[in-house]
Amino acid sequence: MLLKTDVASKLIEELNTETVFSLFGGKLKIDEGTVVSWIIMAVFLIAGILLTRGLKVEGKLSKRQLFIEMCVDKMRSFFHSVMGPDGDRYIPWMMTVAVYIGACNMCGIFGFKSPTKELNVTVGLALTSIILVQYAGIHKKGTKGWLKSFAKPVPIVLPINLLELVIKPMSLCFRLFGNIIGAFIIMKLIEAVVPVAIPVALSLYFDIFDGFIQAYVFVFLTSLYIQEAIED
């Protein structure tokens, strides 16, 4: 009973969004997840500037440039294989979201609260991704063709296809949020039972390996939705 109460209290504490500071006389409250997201963005911005300095188009390339190009090419090849050539225009977005979610899930290693533990963050990510999916369909088929696609392959499936407009973002949102929170609950249960050694190893697993898996699943499903939206 004590273990259950302790884990429940820690879960409630983790789910609570603490206001770090306020703007405009307290009307706009900035919570911890937002601040951590800003830190992640700032780190990526600085890293991007530093890593892309002195890049060459021809001649002898540095090991740094070769490594960066290899990583980008691997990611581009992956998304291209899922979405096809018509989806290449959306690859930069997919790569950005993948790196951002991966970093959010990993920031617990450094003592920060993961922004993906906040439902409003996962809702925002899911909504922007689904809006991109619908935009891809409209861009490829036109507004009239996009509307007609809801009645394919037969008109009777129209209600189901319309329902997917709600189901898909909810699925993306709660899958990411639920897996991150689930990992947190498992870690707290293990820490309460075996407080030494094992929790450290599992923490690295959930913060690094599982964090990357969740980022992969999110962008993979989004790329599949885009592929479905742009296919003839």
Listing of model-derived features with the role each one plays in the protein:
Residues M1-D232:
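Selective transmembrane helix interface/packing segments
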